[in-house]
Regions:
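Carbohydrate transferase catalytic cores enriched for Leloir-type hexosyltransferases
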Residues: 1-143
Length: 143
């Protein structure tokens, strides 16, 4: 099986809660399943610390997705193209975002819903993106 992983939060030396959580889950999946190929989709140059396994293929996909407009491009245009190009069987996204245009099964985890409890703590465009897209992501056809 070819499993695509959203690796955009794997930034060596700059990871916080979501990055650490993402890496610990991905690392264990990769180590425990050497029979599968894992395609790590990064949005910028990556550290080889994340790609030392024989069953990992690292791929950088543009644009760097660090703003709501760029998230939209990355997830709705770049990710579906990459999934098709790399012939992924499933897409696992650990940051609460996924593509609404993918035709393969999706496994989505949502790290937190703080934007609902503390909307004023989140920048306007980020909050708007979460408010619009999180419900849509939760309605798509998951695994």
């Amino acid at each position: 099986m070819r499993i695509a992983l959203n690796a955009r939060f794997l930034i060596e030396g700059k990871m916080e809660g979501i990055g650490y959580s993402c890496w610990e889950i991905y690392r264990r999946m990769i180590e425990l399943n050497p029979q599968h190929t894992f395609i790590l989709f990064f949005d910028r140059p990556y550290s080889t610390v994340f790609t030392t396994f024989k069953n990992v293929i690292p791929v950088v996909i543009s644009p760097p997705a660090r703003h709501p407009f760029l998230w939209l491009i990355w997830f709705e245009w770049s990710i579906p193209r990459a999934l098709k190009k790399w012939q992924a069987d499933v897409f696992f996204s650990h940051d609460g975002f996924t593509s609404l245009k993918t035709t393969i099964p999706v496994f989505l985890t949502i790290h937190d819903l703080a934007f609902l409890a503390f909307p004023k703590q989140v920048p306007f465009l980020v909050h708007y993106f979460y408010k619009i897209f999180t419900p849509l992501y939760l309605k798509i056809n998951f695994m």
